[in-house]
Amino acid sequence: MATTNKVKTIGVLTSGGDAPGMNAAIRAAVRRGLQKGVQMKGILKGYDGLMNEEIIDMTARDVSDTIERGGTILYTARCAEMRTPEGQKRAADVCRKHGIDGLVVIGGDGSFAGAQKLAALGINTVGVPGTIDLDIACTEYTIGFDTAVNTAMEAIDKVRDTSTSHERCSIIEVMGRNAGYIALWCGIANGAEDILLPEKYDYDEQKIINNIIENRRKGKKHHIIVNAEGIGHSTSMARRIEAATGIETRATILGHMQRGGSPTCKDRVYASIMGAYAVDLLLEGKTDRVVAYKNGEYVDYDIDEALSVTKTLPEYQWEIARALSYNYTK
């Protein structure tokens, strides 16, 4: 969708769960806008802060020394009010009150749904995919995934060390309520014996128990299970496995550490380009768009198109993850 109104003031907000690299996107958006002669404003605490008019002017200095920092300097929050027509109208009215005629929204599907509503109310919006879950269908990359999956991988390596020393079975629970990309990638990168994903919910716990017993018979000193939070129940699963196998079994829930930490080079670079690209789209007169990375290029899609498609698990990656497991070694 295009607009004929020239954008003069752009607001930037981060919404929903934080993701490493968000600061790189904020920095890029602010500096690109200032370079193009646009006034830049930061909206604190996402849509909730927008409702409460927590809006600040942003200068190039305000985003200095932020590219290497995890989290988001604009803070973030979830906002139930933004799901209501009254809340959406209030958000649009606040934008107009503060002269914000363009909005960069960094977040996931829920954040984009809010941006879509604001676009319908006359506020030019562009979404930037920021979520560690990698669950936005229109893009091959989302800000934060690379850092989160590396954080999880390094943690699982450490758990493996102690698991081997004590000849234990270890269940490591990673983030991914509805999408198992962190679990899948870590399962491959860490050489896990079993991977449990929300997309493959019909797993057979007895088969896992049988694998553990058989692998121990073959001399395997540890057994690593990477479990997505969408499956969950890692602690109770560990108790059942230990009772059935007689092998000490421990659960480790990585939790919010996956959201923190200094972003990787990949997250910094991709986020920087996406943040700048979002501003460029607004200045080109585009609205109701989402920035994406597809087939080696930075592109943009209509928000409605981005929200209408559910991302599917890459079956070949799943097949290879299972094929390379020790469970299938003869």
Annotated model-derived regions:
Residues S15-D18, I43-G49, R78-C79, G108-G110, ...:
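Short, ordered loop/turn segments at secondary-structure junctions
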Residues D18-A29, M51, P85-K89, G102-Q116, ...:
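Short glycine/serine/threonine-rich phosphate/pyrophosphate-binding segments
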Residues I247, M257-S272, V279-L283:
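Catalytic, metal-anchored helix/loop core of enzyme active sites in primary metabolism
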Residues A2-M51:
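N-terminal phosphate-binding or glycine-rich loops at protein starts, especially the Walker A/P-loop
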Residues A2-T3, L50-L103, G110-S111, I143-N150, ...:
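Glycine-rich oxoanion-binding loops at beta->alpha junctions
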